[in-house]
Design a protein with these regions (language model features):
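Residue-level marker of structural boundaries
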Residues: 20, 66-69, 109
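Conserved SAM/SAH cofactor-binding pocket of Class I
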Residues: 1-57
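Residue-level signal for inorganic ion chemistry
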Residues: 15, 48, 64, 86, ...
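Conserved Class I SAM-dependent methyltransferase catalytic core
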Residues: 77-140
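Mobile active-site "lid"/loop adjacent to the S-adenosyl-L-methionine
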Residues: 51-81
Length: 141
């Protein structure tokens, strides 16, 4: 079984539509904020958290600002609050021997995310690089 969380009702409706189109049976979606989630632990937690810092919003291309809700792009702070929450709560969110995969940006907050991982994570971790050789995903296990 798999679950999906999003605080956006529109995102949940879109996910449900895609689930049906793909014929997926064992997937449930919940309209819930990850900061308030305290249900069952996951074997695999996969997330592309909002990572833009508040000051980066103005430099976004207009097409991005028109298409995506700002809450999907930024935490309206430094861009790291989701990472800090997810990484520091790894053992509450992920089962023993489970895995957390987080997309990370190539931006000013990348080093902050790496520091958060070093400060809050007692588990193993590694980074996957993109085609340009830049860290793009952190795996915590």
């Amino acid at each position: 079984n798999s679950i999906g969380l999003d605080k956006s009702e529109l995102a949940i409706k879109t996910a449900e539509k895609n689930r049906k189109l793909l014929g997926l049976k064992n997937v449930q979606f919940f309209n819930q904020d990850i900061f308030e989630y305290n249900q069952s632990k996951a074997d695999l937690l996969l997330c592309n958290p909002p990572y833009l810092a508040k000051h980066e919003i103005d430099s976004l291309e207009q097409s991005v600002r028109d298409y995506d809700p700002l809450s999907a792009l930024t935490d309206f702070k430094k861009g790291t609050s989701f990472y800090k929450h997810l990484i520091s709560n790894f053992n509450k969110l992920v089962k023993k021997n489970g895995i957390m995969l987080l997309e990370i940006p190539f931006s000013a907050v990348t080093d902050d995310i790496i520091s958060i991982n070093k400060n809050f994570n007692a588990n193993k971790s590694l980074f996957y690089k993109d085609l340009e050789g830049k860290n793009r995903v952190i795996k915590i296990y």
